[in-house]
């Protein structure tokens, strides 16, 4: 069955830019339909659907050098093709930027994950990819119920982290922090969740904002080359994803995630901008209240809350760009099956 759809596998065929990937459809012995739409895009339709069937986008490779999710996704697809992995949900698997992965780079011209807002952007390789991804989402979510839509966008962090895995929950105008989504997070042993406080330009935000999808950006470990990822540290996530796709009840126990709210965004305003810590500082490094950790022009950058922590710091961003997120731990609860915090 694999040979009738892929020469090697979904991942490695997608990365073989010298050979075309022709759109085609096959059906497994289990009745699962596999539709290869284009390079890096595979739709999987279960043999039977019902009112509870999810319509899930599972994407990776938005940044070309974040390869651990690619390896996991390739294994899931291999096992779906062979019949080893049961399928109960309709899935759209996406390898977003094969050209960047082949070059072992994050992106070629622009950061793809900053191109999903409604602002005008300079034409580029990545802008064309973003436009194509928007079309794919529109087609995949067409004629589906909002409650059935999920989008898990899988990444790896550039730097080390106090939390090996963490999720970013986008801020959208729809209720996109469902109890079932958060239960999946705990089942996957994702160590922390960041609750965004403002709209953004990411792929997962776009799904949440425009399609009311239960969407997350998931950071799974640290950037490494293909074949060099520590996948054993993502075993619970792997198992939880397989249970999610098959709609099986998990056999392993969940683990509570640490919850953070984004307290503020640090935007670079001056040429004279720097942090006081080294480039290898870990995500979620916390500061004491009033502790100065950098400057922007004449203004010191300091922690405004005890234990306020920094995530995604980048001293080299252009003026006007986000240089870091600041987060604080928060207690959460559910209202109408949606996660909220006080």
From Swiss-Prot:
Q: Which Gene3D superfamilies match?
A: Zn peptidases
According to the record, cofactor stoichiometry and binding are noted as: Binds 1 zinc ion per subunit.
Q: Does the keyword Transit peptide apply?
A: no
Q: In which pathway does it act?
A: Amino-acid degradation; L-arginine degradation via AST pathway; L-glutamate and succinate from L-arginine: step 5/5
Do you know which Pfam families this protein is assigned to? Answer: AstE_AspA_cat, AstE_AspA_hybrid
Q: For this entry, list what GO says about its biological process.
A: arginine catabolic process to glutamate; arginine catabolic process to succinate
Q: Which SUPFAM superfamilies match?
A: Zn-dependent exopeptidases
> Which reaction(s) are listed as its catalytic activity?
N-succinyl-L-glutamate + H2O = L-glutamate + succinate
Instruction: Give the active-site positions.
Output: 219
Q: Which cofactor does it need?
A: Zn(2+)
Superkingdom assignment: Bacteria
Q: What is its EC number?
A: 3.5.1.96
Q: What class of enzyme is it?
A: hydrolase
Q: Which UniProt keywords apply?
A: Arginine metabolism, Hydrolase, Metal-binding, Zinc
**Which residues are involved in binding Zn(2+)?**
63, 66, 155
Q: Name one GO molecular function term.
A: succinylglutamate desuccinylase activity
Q: Which InterPro entries match?
A: AspA/AstE_fam (IPR050178), AstE_AspA_cat (IPR055438), Aste_AspA_hybrid_dom (IPR007036), SuccinylGlu_desuccinylase (IPR016681)
Family, as annotated: Belongs to the AspA/AstE family. Succinylglutamate desuccinylase subfamily.
Which PANTHER family does the UniProt entry name for this protein? ASPARTOACYLASE, SUCCINYLGLUTAMATE DESUCCINYLASE
Name the job this protein performs: Transforms N(2)-succinylglutamate into succinate and glutamate.
Q: What is this protein called?
A: Succinylglutamate desuccinylase
